[in-house]
Amino acid sequence: FDPEAAALFEAVVESAYLVANSDGHFDETERAAFEHVVVTACQGAVVDGQIHALIEDLADLLGEDGVDKRVEMVAKSISRADHQQEVLRVAALLAHVSGGVSDEERELLSKLQRAFGLDESALARALAEAESAVAP
């Protein structure tokens, strides 16, 4: 068991969920992309029921704590800059999948970037990488 890898997985998954929900809508495109992130991160070792339970758990945490507290918790769990950049990149990818990055999604990504203590170029890099990944 690698605690650093587990923390990275949890941060990637939660940040993706937070971005997907930042505009108040968790649409089918975002849900499918979120599920793909989870399945890929788990190397296919999860089933639909587990993903549904994970989404419910994340929704409960967001409802109980609010977005700012959840961003803070994600940021506290990741100390390595390369891991922080990866969390931002995956979150930016989720933001791009349903018609581009909304103002709400961009604000949440900015909160993550600031909570990590990264400069604005880190977010710009993450957004550019995500945009090129979803470009036709």
Feature annotation, model-predicted:
Residues 1-136:
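Small-residue-enriched hydrophobic alpha-helices in membranes
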